[in-house]
């Protein structure tokens, strides 16, 4: 936990938001996206599985969390209200955004359910059937989307994204080159017009002779 807290704090000192993952009870990689169910009692969960995350959240001050594919008992960790809102935000005081692990072609990973239970972002580099909201008009969905946006923006604005050092201004030499190129282009057009007029005039003189 303290290793994770130090890594997160170090990254955040440079304006990087580091994802604490995989939250939680992600105890095996084999078949991890195939409805893997991890069973444990509350004492084991709190004292063994959650303790490193708790230290990373409280001591490291993390502002971004990635949930896991697995189920905790019979509930997907990425849409577990007791875990994401109850423990993470409620008990530990976490402020920031939660993103899913990578969306696969699995029916149980549903964004409409996830966003209502404390998950803010769905991780996928291309569109699948369930990684976007299908309900965007109901009162519960609008409320959940508003909260998710707030969580995401809180994380982003507390990173280096809006640091003045990121502002990129055009170097003087580049501005000078642009001006020179424009002037040369104008000069080239003028010369072409004059050349054409001279050629046309010479043609008329030759014809009259």
Which sequence ranges carry the predicted segments?
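Glycoside hydrolase catalytic-domain context in secreted enzymes
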Residues: 1-208
